[in-house]
């Protein structure tokens, strides 16, 4: 066990203590992944931008699945923003109207993952409370204020890798001990585990 691994676990336990995390019951191994393997700013910023546009479209389609005007608007604005090629296949299907109802629901269900990604770009407080939903509008506003992906990347600053690693470890521990709203815990883990893998589509990640 390295000193860095110990620091990650100690930080995770400290973050989770106010929410009932019990150190004596921990059996999840300390994360073996190197904190330096966390995705870089460019990849994270592009995922945030693409997800934000796709989620806004999903919300509109849940009201009216035949809202072609909003589809066209999001296609244009995401292209102008520079993230249309960063969308997952499921998100692209929403843009072009060849999606299923499940696709809409899945993209809508990515809101908490998007909020985690916004946090990683210093876009809000750390989502350490496993019972409190994130401020989704604040996450969208990180993208809106950017105006374009290049400006977003210039404005953004990644939180320290140790903090990202600690949050990954924390949510693995929350899942193990059944702490908090497990639907919320799982939704956030989608993004947290995505930070460590090469897969672009976070909805395809299994843990």
Regions found by a protein language model. Name each.
Residues 2-207:
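Extended, charge-rich alpha-helical interface modules
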